[in-house]
């Protein structure tokens, strides 16, 4: 297998090709990509945790250093000004010398405001890509060249197609996240609180809570019915019934995003429902192939949910087709089947149909689906179906013509378990689907 350095070299070739194309299309000379800046808390001298511009880390795996700049023109070697101040108050990252630095000119930038003297004098035809427009204006970059929509759309669209380097990084992120999931599962079995389970996860992954790509969802019992629950109770409940963990990891700026659900007692209706959701998730993945719309798989899973609602007698005396048609499956799975994954957890361009930014919205019936693209090789997506017992979504169904079809006694018995989500990260290849998560033996 090629080394990471060799993969990165080819990655840069691909990014250079895309850069040439976008510069030609919009008649630009170069892109100036800013890593970003620290942002202080209001009325304070402490900064929020730094989050790098994803368009910057697409080029170089520098994720923790603000005030860095990249100049790329698609022809010459990318030029990186790496912020290297003299500072005895804060840690200063050394000038990098690693697998990727042969492909980039790395130049020390001792002062954050010193970039102006380093750039070409003529900047009227350079596009700024970054989070601080006023910094670009201060560099005499025209306002219409600051994050121009056409350029951003183009860059975002092609980020869906991962290079071999990117896929390698994402597989490494999977390994780290799987280690965390295994440690968290053991902590759950030992009766730990959500807070302590999260600590076990972070220790196993070697991440801080500011390093993970999103806030870990560590949900015991009914907390699993809150889709993005991040509270982390310090005390374990008196009775632990279930555990939903949605937590990822990052490698060289690329994310993993995994979810598993466990029952404390393996011989309960809820435990059997977990197994069935898991089986249906794997069955759905087995049907996936390039050339099919992601929307089709979302709709297909609602049909699978209807089958499970019938099997477990959660909804009765109604055909599976009628359940889907009348959206009785909707309150049980209110989110989409998944989303694109990459430099960002909810990666960009999920709705773009071409590199000019043509937008195809999610179906009105399923407004929270995050991707409407046709699957193509090199795309990476999550597949994360769920079944939840959420009062605010189910209560409106307690009245009306369909109420009699809901087994409210069964639903009320399942509510204390919260809900189920099973999430894998998959790569679309020309003739197969690679399940990066299951390849790491995460059951």
From Swiss-Prot:
It catalyses: Xaa-L-Pro dipeptide + H2O = an L-alpha-amino acid + L-proline. Mn(2+) 2 binds at residues 246, 257, 423. Keywords: Dipeptidase, Hydrolase, Manganese, Metal-binding, Metalloprotease, Protease. It holds the Pfam family PepQ_N. Its cofactor is Mn(2+). Its EC number is 3.4.13.9. It is an enzyme of class 3 (hydrolase). Binds 2 manganese ions per subunit. GO terms for cellular component: cytosol. One of its GO terms (biological process) is proteolysis. The keyword Protease applies. InterPro entries: Creatin/AminoP/Spt16_N, Creatinase/aminopeptidase-like, PepQ_N, Pept_M24, Peptidase_M24B_aminopep-P_CS, X-Pro_dipept-like, X_Pro_dipept. The keyword Metal-binding applies. Mn(2+) 1 binds at residues 257, 339, 384, 423. It comes from the Bacteria. PROSITE patterns: PROLINE_PEPTIDASE (PS00491). One of its GO terms (molecular function) is metal ion binding. CDD domains: Prolidase. NCBIfam families: PRK13607.1. Splits dipeptides with a prolyl residue in the C-terminal position. PANTHER family: XAA-PRO AMINOPEPTIDASE 3 (PTHR43226), XAA-PRO DIPEPTIDASE (PTHR43226:SF8). Belongs to the peptidase M24B family. Bacterial-type prolidase subfamily. This is Xaa-Pro dipeptidase. The gene is pepQ.
């Amino acid at each position: 297998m090629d080394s990471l350095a060799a993969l990165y070299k080819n990655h840069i070739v691909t990014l250079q090709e895309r850069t040439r194309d976008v510069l030609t299309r919009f008649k630009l000379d170069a892109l100036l990509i800013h890593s970003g800046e620290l942002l202080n808390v209001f009325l304070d001298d402490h900064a929020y945790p730094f989050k790098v511009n994803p368009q910057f880390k697409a080029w170089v795996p520098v994720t923790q250093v603000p005030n860095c700049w990249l100049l790329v023109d698609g022809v010459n070697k990318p030029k990186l000004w790496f912020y290297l101040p003299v500072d005895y108050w804060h840690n200063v990252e050394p000038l990098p010398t690693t697998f990727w630095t042969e492909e980039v000119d790395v130049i020390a930038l001792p002062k954050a405001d010193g970039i102006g003297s380093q750039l070409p004098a003529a900047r009227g035809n350079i596009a700024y890509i970054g989070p601080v427009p006023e910094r670009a204006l201060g560099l005499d970059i025209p306002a219409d060249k600051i994050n121009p929509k056409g350029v951003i759309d183009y860059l975002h669209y092609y980020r869906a197609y991962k290079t071999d380097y990117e896929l390698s990084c994402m597989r490494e992120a999977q390994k780290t996240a799987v280690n965390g999931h295994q440690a968290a599962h053991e902590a759950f079995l030992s009766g730990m609180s959500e807070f302590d389970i999260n600590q076990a996860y972070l220790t196993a992954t070697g991440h801080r809570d500011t390093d993970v790509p999103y806030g870990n969802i560590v949900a015991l019992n009914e907390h699993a019915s809150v889709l993005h629950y991040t509270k982390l109770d310090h005390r374990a409940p008196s009775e632990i019934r279930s555990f939903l963990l949605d937590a990822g990891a990052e490698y060289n700026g690329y994310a993993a995003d995994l979810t598993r659900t466990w029952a404390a007692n393996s011989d309960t209706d809820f435990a059997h429902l977990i197994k069935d959701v898991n089986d249906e998730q794997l069955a759905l993945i087995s049907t996936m192939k390039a050339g099919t719309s992601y929307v089709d798989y979302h709709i297909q899973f609602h049909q699978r949910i209807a089958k499970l609602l019938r099997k477990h007698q959660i909804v009765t005396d109604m055909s599976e087709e009628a359940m889907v048609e009348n959206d009785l499956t909707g309150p049980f799975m209110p989110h989409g089947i998944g989303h694109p994954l990459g430099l960002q957890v909810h990666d960009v361009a999920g709705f773009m149909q071409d590199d000019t930014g043509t937008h195809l919205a999610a179906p009105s019936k399923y407004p929270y689906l995050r991707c409407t693209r046709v699957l193509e090789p090199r795309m990476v997506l999550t597949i994360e179906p769920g079944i939840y017992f959420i009062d605010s979504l189910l209560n409106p169904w307690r009245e009306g013509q369909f109420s009699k079809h809901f087994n409210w006694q069964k639903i009320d018995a399942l509510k204390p378990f919260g809900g189920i989500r099973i999430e894998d990260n998959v790569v679309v290849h020309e003739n197969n689907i690679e399940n990066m998560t299951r390849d790491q033996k995460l059951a």
